[in-house]
Swiss-Prot record:
It comes from the Bacteria. It is found in: Cytoplasm. D-alanine binds at D189, V293, K473. GO terms for molecular function: ATP binding; D-alanine [D-alanyl carrier protein] ligase activity. It holds the Pfam family AMP-binding. This is D-alanine--D-alanyl carrier protein ligase. Signal peptide: none annotated.
Amino acid sequence: MTDIINKLQAFADANPQSIAVRHTTDELTYQQLMDESSKLAHRLQGSKKPMILFGHMSPYMIVGMIGAIKAGCGYVPVDTSIPEDRIKMIINKVQPEFVFNTTDESFESLAGEVFTIEDIKTSQDPVIFDSQIKDNDTVYTIFTSGSTGEPKGVQIEYASLVQFTEWMLELNKSGNEQQWLNQAPFSFDLSVMAIYPCLASGGTLNLVDKNMINKPKLLNEMLTATPINIWVSTPSFMEMCLLLPTLNEEQYGSLNEFFFCGEILPHRAAKALVSRFPSATIYNTYGPTEATVAVTSIQITQEILDQYPTLPVGVERPGARLSTTDEGELVIEGQSVSLGYLKNDQKTAEVFNFDDGIRTYHTGDKAKFENGQWFIQGRIDFQIKLNGYRMELEEIETQLRQSEFVKEAIVVPVYKNDKVIHLIGAIVPTTEVTDNAEMTKNIKNDLKSRLPEYMIPRKFEWMEQLPLTSNGKIDRKKIAEVING
């Protein structure tokens, strides 16, 4: 595959009435997707700045993506859940010529001409448009959190997206024209893992409604109505869905492939999924936004579960060469690496290198290569110092999850005068806690055999489930707010 757009057009010509994208009761066929995106592309033609794509889980968000790619300008997805001040920061940074508002609400942009869905539907522009995108053009820019509070716009080139899509289709064992499930909002690059491999293989992209993110029963209704074949989500979202006793192979026999990315896949969750879907293909993948979604993968089997108490993230893919610094920081090199941060030379220079035409990115993740597999060992910036000891919060969390009494865990440092004074563990227990002191004692006894005393949390807070962000990741900030009152 050398071009995603040509691939989509060829499938649309051969199968015009096949459903390309579905969200609740809204659907677009491949013919509609290509026609509407062409009309949008005519309006964007000649623009040298990325289009702001505003909305949530709407089929017309996909129209916006394909239209912006055809026009060659690329897009910046902005989710409706993002705070207004952050939206303003993004628009100020991008200074777009065009904004595509896919919501029913008015959207006043600080810059750029605003189009609506109705504008495109009623447009008399031609439904044929020859794609203008080039391999080295920026296809999308996704804004991630910045340490200074200002979001950073990660620019990904078209050739990187094409290469990633090809790799995903090589991993995919389910074949073409499958029903894919996408959990992630479009401002989160995990969504790329579902969108382009699905459409490039003639599949139907099924979008999880935002109301389902913390309500697995609503997802159950969706899965019952639509026989999903391929599931793409964060591990945390899948763990929440495992609260449904009906989520198993017997109930959903069509569900035969899972892709996870965005955060660590806990061993306990993977074990439960393998048990419930013994015939399914399950992939654990790893990658930062700055390296086009994912750069490693491993198929999780019972053999892998038995061999590794902490799951590896697998081996590198084409376009990504992995290594570590002397301090253990993971470095990614190759075509998968981003073009840098939009209009932020200082931050780009801190973590990217483009010498001799080779792109490298320092991830900030600690990693090791062992037994032919890569392992992620936490974030460098998740290190804290307590009583003179430097430690990794994620190491403590990993050991907590090994306890028979712990289903899920997050460790929160408690500060006083900008100094960490002790640790608290937010715990989802495997059984109901009837005796707080006894449960605390049991968990601490488990930890004492694996961690030094100074790394053991002083106390634990019990939670029914860990809250998730709109991206489907564990919401560490909210947990800290709850614990610190």
